[in-house]
């Protein structure tokens, strides 16, 4: 396989005042959790470690990677509603915000990937892409109206709206259960250590997944495929594959590209808990999956919802969601429709 050369992109200019303005709602919490994660190392037991790793898979694999990312953001597959809600609760316990916030940020990332407006592009620095955008930045300071523009589907779901408002509740309940079962030691490992590992696993996809690795597809961003990022993120490290074909539930497109979340989705299909699965495979140039809304190859998004929930049926969910009735937004929407998007070419 020939590796496609990464794009040479100019840095995104982030307002320096914004970069220096600490998010006091987030920074102290992250500091506390990192202190707790370090403290857990002094109270090590194998039982506590295995509990932490199991919860890491439940919250990071089933929750973030499979539910927040592939199910809610990209609608790569569907599940019964009760199971979708269960997976969402698992994701919320990862301490990465409620479903409306997480999905809105990720859809915006795909809309502006490595361009002005991307919440966490490494074009403004590796640290910014990893955690700087969380500790400072404006990505987590989104009002309800802004969120609804990016997630009109989730905004109509009362459960997702409620869970976004009370997203700390599942973590509090989990902590209480762990304390009742195994005392403070189990809380240190099952809450603090597990959460910190999960946070950095997510952040490293945003940073390393756009810096180091190989590029099978010539996408118009800097996304890369990275095997070790894929291992810690349950398959999301095949990031160039994902940016080439966002609607695909399968990120590891080759047999040797380990994608644990894809294996889980396949198992769920066998037991009747997953259906309408979009399985992207390299075939010279990628084509939109059956049922996908007409869009550019880079932002294809299959929506099970009526087109009336979208601002424009001709654009992807996270592309058209930023439009409103203002003249400037209408001009931007027309420009997006006319934008020249050459076919993706797979490098073998």
Segments from the language model and where they lie:
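Non-catalytic, topology-defining segments of multipass membrane proteins
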Residues: 1-203, 248-332, 336-348
């Amino acid at each position: 396989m020939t590796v496609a050369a990464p794009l040479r992109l100019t840095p995104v200019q982030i307002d320096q005042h914004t970069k220096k303005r600490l998010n006091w709602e987030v920074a102290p919490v992250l500091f506390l959790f990192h202190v707790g994660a370090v403290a857990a190392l002094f109270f090590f037991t194998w039982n506590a470690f295995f509990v932490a790793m199991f919860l890491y898979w439940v919250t990071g694999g089933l929750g973030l990677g499979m539910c927040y990312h592939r199910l809610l953001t990209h609608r790569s597959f569907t599940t019964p509603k009760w199971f979708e809600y269960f997976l969402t609760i698992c994701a919320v316990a990862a301490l990465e915000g409620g479903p409306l916030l997480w999905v809105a940020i990720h859809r915006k990332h795909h809309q502006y990937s490595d361009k002005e407006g991307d919440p966490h592009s490494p074009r403004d620095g590796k640290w910014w892409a990893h955690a700087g955008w969380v500790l400072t930045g404006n990505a987590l300071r989104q009002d309800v109206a802004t969120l609804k523009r990016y997630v009109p589907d989730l905004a109509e779901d009362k459960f997702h709206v409620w869970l976004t408002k009370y997203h700390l509740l599942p973590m509090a309940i989990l902590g209480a259960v762990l304390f009742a079962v195994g005392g403070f030691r189990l809380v240190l490992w099952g809450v603090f250590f597990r959460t910190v590992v999960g946070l950095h696993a997510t952040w490293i996809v945003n940073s390393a997944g756009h810096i180091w690795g190989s590029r099978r597809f010539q996408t118009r961003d800097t996304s890369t495929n990275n095997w070790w990022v894929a291992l810690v993120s349950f398959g999301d490290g095949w990031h160039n594959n994902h940016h080439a074909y966002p609607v695909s539930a399968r990120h590891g497109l080759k047999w040797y590209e380990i994608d644990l979340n894809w294996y889980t989705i396949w198992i769920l299909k066998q037991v009747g808990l997953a259906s309408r699965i979009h399985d992207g495979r390299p075939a010279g140039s990628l084509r939109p999956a059956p049922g996908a809304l007409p869009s550019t190859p880079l932002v294809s998004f299959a929506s099970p919802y009526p087109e009336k929930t979208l601002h424009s049926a001709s654009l992807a969910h996270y592309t058209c969601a930023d439009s409103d009735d203002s003249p400037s937004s209408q001009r931007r929407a027309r420009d997006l429709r006319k934008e020249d998007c050459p076919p993706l070419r797979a490098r073998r």
